[in-house]
Amino acid sequence: MRLDLERSTYEAYTVYFNRHIIPYFARVGDLNNLTARHVKNYINYKRTDGRCDGKQGGLSIVTVKKHLSLIKQALNDAVILGYIPANPALSVKMRRSTRSITEKTVLLTADEAFKVIDAFEGHPLHACVTLALVYGLRRSEVLGLKWSAIDFTRNELRIEHTVVKGLTIEAKDSTKTPTSRATFELIPRVREMLLELYERRPKNTEYINVWSDGRLFRPDYVTRGFQRVLKNNGLERMRFHDLRHSTASILYDRGLSLEEAKRWLRHNDIETTSNIYIHCSRGRQKLTSSTISDIFQK
């Protein structure tokens, strides 16, 4: 399995096994004693009280589904190698979730989005937050932005590089999926912000979102710093990824069609967009980059 995975994915899976799966199932003893009930109990435990970071509560459905998938893959390998006669986890199923948005997800209105952007004025994360809201970028895409991806002459911004965190920080010339690569128009607000950053950029780095000495922002700094500024300004607690959700909900609320929202967010399929944003639909007029510009003007 190692040869088929990207480094960051492999490292994340290693964490799942070492922190969660192996410690839990060690109590079972011999692998031949493992039953479907053991696996089901593990799933239920992780959903309700299975965090390993000292916080209360369970893991998300998405994360636990990854755990189950890894367990099934590992046990399939055990069958192939002759350690066990059959895979006891094959009969364990999880209810399919049709929504990527949960009750904890915060969807900002356009006015609320402005308040969030204003709260970060003068803060190192100002550009990260602005870019995430305007273009619906993922954290990895925001951190992966290089000056070479900005063309002030053509007025374009390209998404073609990411920075992710596994056991180490990894920068790579690839995106989450092939459809994640994109070219956006630089709206006036973003163009002005980037020009100002470019004038005072550190000379020893090619990345945009960095410290004054050129060091790249760590992904976990973005997460924690984002939460801290929201709290200090009395704003509602939300995840950095909720900015991406908010981008589409704002556009969809203004009349963007489902297909256009899919293209802007660069989802693989329209079902993903529909599952997340269908409840935000109110209008049906076509919006383009000019509308994005109008929404995010000063």
What are these model-derived regions, one by one?
Residues 6-9, 13, 35, 63, ...:
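Hydrophobic (often cysteine-bearing) scaffold residues that line and stabilize catalytic clefts
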Residues 18, 72-75, 79, 281, ...:
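C-terminal flanking helix
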